[in-house]
Amino acid sequence: MIIVTGGAGMIGSNIVKSLNDKGFNDILVVDNLKDGKKFKNLVDLDITDYMDKEDFITQIMAGDDFGPIEAIFHEGACSATTEWDGKYIMMNNYEYSKELLHFCIEREIPFLYASSAATYGETDTFIEEREYEGALNVYGYSKQQFDNYVRRLWADAEEHNETLSQITGFRYFNVYGPREQHKGSMASVAFHLNNQMNAGDNPKLFEGSDEFKRDFVYVGDVAAVNLWFLENGVSGIYNCGTGRAEPFRAVAEAVIKHHGKGEVETIPFPEHLKGAYQEFTQADLTKLRAAGCDVEFKSVADGVAEYMAMINK
């Protein structure tokens, strides 16, 4: 059995789909369906069982056995970069993750987890090293702190000549693609621009967006990276992006191209995002490629075109 936490979320459900595509369906999905709309991400997927997140945490902390587990993909987290309840964020993204990590280490279960490019903050160097990290919000800090916790475990194991089971973290950059309709304001730019155009409006970007560039990565490619690392048993913390920074306007132009009409309009930059907004991200893929991962990443033009075709049927 493979366990996918956050399995009803965007990345988690795409990992489940990729597993299904490979003929694997002995999967336990763990999530919180308080937002019942997320169930739609599971309707077309084959899984063995579903468990509520709180029940799962309780059983993990009690040391309960779930039977033979081949791997755990830990995608469950509060992913809202605009959430400032630090106690809530640290409990969900840090404490819960530590409990699950030690559960896996004790049983030698491969543990593949979601980190984030939000760990880097305002920098133009995106290398998986401590010196380049400086989160701008509490979400990014929770991910940064968990990465550092994992690093300390590796250092301690090395000092004592011990070898830990597989632990692999992925610093996701700007992920977009299918199964994100439940995310509200945290859904991708492509999703929001498409909704605007379907409502008869022009696509709207923040003022200054011509200067903002992000590494936009297609969710299908993210799932492929996760499965590659499971299949190859490689540990480490790795950037998961395309290695290319593209302007927000490129996303808007891809959406406009699909619809065959429209032009970009600008709106004021939100006050609440000032000082907590990454204006530039670009994954350095040196470490990912050195590990042997050869997954090819779609450009914005190709990825958004595929995405638009899927959600505008």
Swiss-Prot record:
SUPFAM superfamilies: NAD(P)-binding Rossmann-fold domains. It is an enzyme of class 5 (isomerase). The gene is hldD. This is ADP-L-glycero-D-manno-heptose-6-epimerase. The keyword NADP applies. NADP(+) binds at residues 10-11, 31-32, 38, 53, 75-79, 92, 143, 175, 183. Catalyzes the interconversion between ADP-D-glycero-beta-D-manno-heptose and ADP-L-glycero-beta-D-manno-heptose via an epimerization at carbon 6 of the heptose. The active site is at 139 (proton acceptor), 183 (proton acceptor). It comes from Aliivibrio fischeri (strain MJ11) (Vibrio fischeri). One of its GO terms (molecular function) is NADP binding. Binds 1 NADP(+) per subunit. Substrate binds at residues 174, 185, 192, 206-209, 214, 277. It catalyses: ADP-D-glycero-beta-D-manno-heptose = ADP-L-glycero-beta-D-manno-heptose. Pfam families: Epimerase. Belongs to the NAD(P)-dependent epimerase/dehydratase family. HldD subfamily. Contains a large N-terminal NADP-binding domain, and a smaller C-terminal substrate-binding domain. It comes from the Bacteria. InterPro entries: Epimerase_deHydtase, Heptose_epim, NAD(P)-bd_dom_sf. PANTHER family: ADP-L-GLYCERO-D-MANNO-HEPTOSE-6-EPIMERASE, NUCLEOSIDE-DIPHOSPHATE-SUGAR EPIMERASE. Its cofactor is NADP(+). CDD domains: ADP_GME_SDR_e. Keywords: Carbohydrate metabolism, Isomerase, NADP. Its EC number is 5.1.3.20. Homopentamer. NCBIfam families: heptose_epim (TIGR02197), PRK11150.1 (NF008360). One of its GO terms (biological process) is carbohydrate metabolic process.
